[in-house]
């Protein structure tokens, strides 16, 4: 009996060791650990006033860009300021574009404002501009809806919170109070969440919200991150960061999403922006996620910006547009093209204004 007990203990220890060994290798593979960093620089300079990241950026057709800054205390990612987050606006048609802080009016606790993904919606009926902002006060997830009042004011209209919106990363607005949002994890506790990653459980999703209904619009995603919409409003794009893919869904009547395809990108990509003119898809990506989680200023996390041309076609083309080993820009999360210019935002570092010509 004692001998059998020893065998069982030894077998259990061996099984646990094997599982943790598998988990370590799996996480390293998903994180693209030790991946060779491609370098491709552009003519760029840092945007003034942006010192602690611009996690998401989006731009209107007239060149007015909105920036979400100061994300902190989120998923144990590095951050270097505990100050409340801020929103900025930037006129890309100005000869020297400079971010201007937006003044926020209304009943919103600015002391706990922690902005993440953003989206903008223009109501064609009266040209009103609505800004949707994912907010994480005290590590919660909610969506703030603002009306933009020229030229530097946001009027807070509404806070949206719902059990289905439990871990919102990004958002794409499709109406004045209507949006799709990604949940980037299933569990809030670290241990079970790591288990879902190790076991490749695709339990993340996209949620559709309107004042009339809230429901899952798409599931089966391992780690839903950035989300955006095609210029013709027909397709929704979702970045599955751990699968190193961009998932394409067709948007049908009744706000139903039907999976179409996935495009491999070979990187850990976050936010998605779409060129208003060409329809090209731009993504801010991480070359090696282990350098984010184990931040070392001597070996900083790099940045990669990629573009996908003809994403709906049978032969989409993925190209590297910018690459840096972290000594110019750390932890890129978003890239926004506009008439030969490019804005690049980051998780916690600075933001770049670049020329594509």
Could you describe each region identified by the protein language model?
Residues 230, 245, 265-322:
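Loop/turn-rich, solvent-exposed surfaces of beta-rich toroidal or solenoidal domains
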Residues 27-52, 97-104, 153-154, 315-326:
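A short helix->beta-strand "capping" segment at the edge of beta-propeller domains
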Residues 329-357:
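Blade-level signature of beta-propeller repeat domains, shared across WD40, Kelch, NHL, RCC1
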Residues 82-94, 141-150, 197-211, 299-312:
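Beta-propeller blade signature
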